[in-house]
Amino acid sequence: MTPKPYCLFVTSFLPYPTGGGSAMRASVALEVLSSRYSVIVVQPELWARREGIFHDDWVRAHSAAFFRIHPHHVQDIRPLVEDFLAGEPGGAALDVVYAFRQAVAPLAINCFNAAGSRPRVTILDLDDDECAHNEQFAPLHEAAGEAALAAKLRSEIATKKLFLAMLMPRFNHLLLASADDCRTLRSRHPAHSFVHLPNAVRAPESPAAGVNRDPRSILFVGSLDYLPNEDAVAFFARSILPLIRERDDRMTFRIVGVGQSESIAAVRRFPGVRLIGAVPDLVPEYASAGMLVVPLRAGSGTRIKILEAFQHRTPVVSTTKGAEGLAVTNGEHLLIADTPEEFAAACLRLSSDDDLCRRLTEKAHAWVVQHHSIDTVRRILRECWGAPSIDSPRPRH
């Protein structure tokens, strides 16, 4: 049997099939890569570890080696990779290097000639446009009274643009979750290969047993220490939920996700709010919810939470911003509402109209299976690693 070629996968997020969007996107990429390559996963811990929900057993099952690196020891990444390759039979070398997110790109570049040869294909998965990310986060910090932090985010935009401009020539392919981000960056940097790699969601392995859908249960899913989600939860609890409960005080707002902040904890005091926090399995949450709400007012990329709800046949109400980057149609796949009054009315419609829920979820499920499956990601990544892009130069040293 011919041994698999080797791929280095560098990510600051621990790949995991449930939880935050970045962890889920990284897990899909790793699953696809591991079907073709012996993958060496390197995770520099640039952010605090989330214990109890994310486990490295999933990564170890999908990799040939897994190295978790303390931020003070990132200089050890290349020697670790070289030592691993030296211990493999037949003069092992890297065929592909895949960097997940801009922050780890320099660490991946430093390994390009590990074991004495350059990788055939180099990929930088940007996920989203980080400059747009800063531009949208700054007003949220201003609204929270954090003017200094807002100013800092704006001051970083020029530096991030310069950093990206320096990184792009080193990679054959630059991946983005949003087709809109792809178009924007292609127009700015026509010499480089930007590839739309949509987020993907897995079909549930089995339905939630013994769980009945409650049409009056409103679900929010997301990382609860991510500023746009903090703003969205507070916006819904303060401005939308009271309007809903004026009409039907049996309606409840269930908040599920990893992490937590002071602003999230503060919404506990509102009538009808159920702050659940992290759960090991989202299948029962989607199965029991009458709807998922995505009341985002800022953010970038695409919303995996919407794709998950579509896969689980849970109706969705979202702001325009929340559904940004997804080729979905209001009234066909989900309901779009931007003012508190419109959003409350949409939630009340779903709670009382079974036929509407059925029409939306049937269309939404068919759409997500067609456009956001792991098979879609597999096809696109195979095209990337099939041959380097003619538009982007080979890695330099």
In which residue ranges do the predicted regions lie?
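N-terminal subdomain of nucleotide-sugar transferases
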Residues: M1-A65, A92
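Short hydrophobic beta-strand element within catalytic cores of glycosyltransferases
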Residues: K305-A309, P315-T319, L335
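Acceptor-binding helix/loop patch of EC 2.4 sugar-transfer enzymes
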Residues: T122-L162, S223
